[in-house]
Amino acid sequence: SGTSLTDQILASNTKVSSLGEVGYADEMAVQVKELSGKHYPQGLSELTQEDISLLRATFLGKISQSHSDNVVLIDKTPMNFQYLGLLAEVFPSAKFIHCSRNPMDNCFSIFKLAFADDQDYAHDLKSLGDHYRLYKGLMDQWKEMYPQRILDVRYEDTVSDIQEQCVRLVEFLDLDFEPEMLEFYSTKRLVRTLSASQVRKPIYKSS
């Protein structure tokens, strides 16, 4: 869907650090159950301001000091879309970049990749289609709830005109455009995703 590409472009800005796919939102959802006695999302409405402050402090406590001076921190975990409501409440100033792609291309790309066995939907095309519909419905709901805090970035648009998408991204995040973002593939950082090799190359349209 272009998450790794968008992440690498943004991480090429000197004011941005990417945490990678850390999965902290998963852990936060478990904490919601511990604090409220109810699973997320039902438990979200039961949280006190003290609970929310604790969730925020726990999340931030896991972030390395090396990221502390940056204006923007990115958690690019793809499954974070499930927890957008939780993240929005815990971090009132957070913004969300929704990376999307043509549904058929997106699903087939997932199907071809060797995802973990706990993601059973990724190994069956019908299950992938069902999963995509659920994801799309949830994202539509989040966009209604937080219209000013979500930016849609389509993979096809980035490939077609990377400079225009860079401008959209920095304006959304209140950052300055830096030319290095256009040469994201030159940025020296560790990328631990199945798309790692792709973000080491200039934009191409064959994926």
Regions found by a protein language model. Give the residues of each.
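PAPS-dependent sulfotransferases, especially Golgi type II membrane carbohydrate sulfotransferases
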Residues: Y40-V71, I110-D152, V159-S207
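A secondary-structure boundary/capping signal
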Residues: E21, R154-Y155
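Phosphate-binding active sites in nucleotide-utilizing proteins
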Residues: S1-F91, K95, C99-S100
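Acidic, metal-coordinating catalytic cores used for nucleic-acid/nucleotide bond scission
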Residues: P78-M79, D157-D161
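Conserved P-loop NTPase nucleotide-binding/switch module
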Residues: L87-F91, I97-D118, A122
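Conserved nucleotide-binding/hydrolysis micro-motifs of P-loop NTPases
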Residues: G23-A25, P103-N106, T158-V159
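Short runs of predominantly hydrophobic/aromatic residues within well-ordered alpha helices
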Residues: N80, S93-F96, P103, C107, ...
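Short, compositionally biased low-complexity segments
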Residues: D26-L35, M104, S195-I203
